[in-house]
Amino acid sequence: RYVCMIIPSRWMAGGRGVGDFEGFRQRMLGDHGTRELVDFPVASEVFPGVEVKGGICYFLWDGMYNGKARVRTIRGDEQQVALRNLDEFDVFVRDQRAVDILHKVLAKKEQSITTILTNKEPFKFETNFKDHHPKQRDRDVPIYLIASGKRTSAWVKTDLVEKNTHLIKTWKVLVPQAYGAGETTPHQILGKPIIAPSPSVCTGSFMFFHVKLKREAESVQSYYATKFFRFLVSLRKITQLAQRSVYTW
């Protein structure tokens, strides 16, 4: 009748790969048999000296129960307690205080920023792509990449671009696909963006928002840096991974 387990919390919103946590998350959120869910965003508060990206949680499932879960979120001396429907969203929003704000945002029914955001490896160049050179040659295009842990740019033959060729001639706001771990607060949530003029491409170290004009790119960059934008992202980004899905609301 009862199941009690302690597990990493990254199932709530994140996890590498689509299939790794998606099925488990859907089952956990859709099954109303969870009586108690206790979440520790900072795993070291449960296991001192141990780092678990996204935190630790434990839950009590009751096969005879069908109702709301009593959710406790514990971070240091602060504790939030609420009775909640776990399936209110497609991911579990850990901070109860954020739910009211999120409802107001969703009520606007505005178009998601993901409509101008690419997926990973937008030009099919992997993060370790090497077929580039430091000086411009005929039919080259600038390529933005990370080499030896540093952001830099080089040149690559336009003919090597096999994917999203229509996006070469767009202004881009490049954003890293991983940043931080999300355990301690306050923190930036997202890495620093780069504006890449048209024409340009990038390796798989980046995704990008694509627009037509420089001023639009500057507007996206400015919005990306706001606390409001990062707050919304933080509701889905609970590990270091910053995949396209974390920008979805």
Residue spans of the language-model regions?
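C-terminal substrate-recognition regions of SAM-dependent nucleic acid methyltransferases
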Residues: 44-203, 209-249
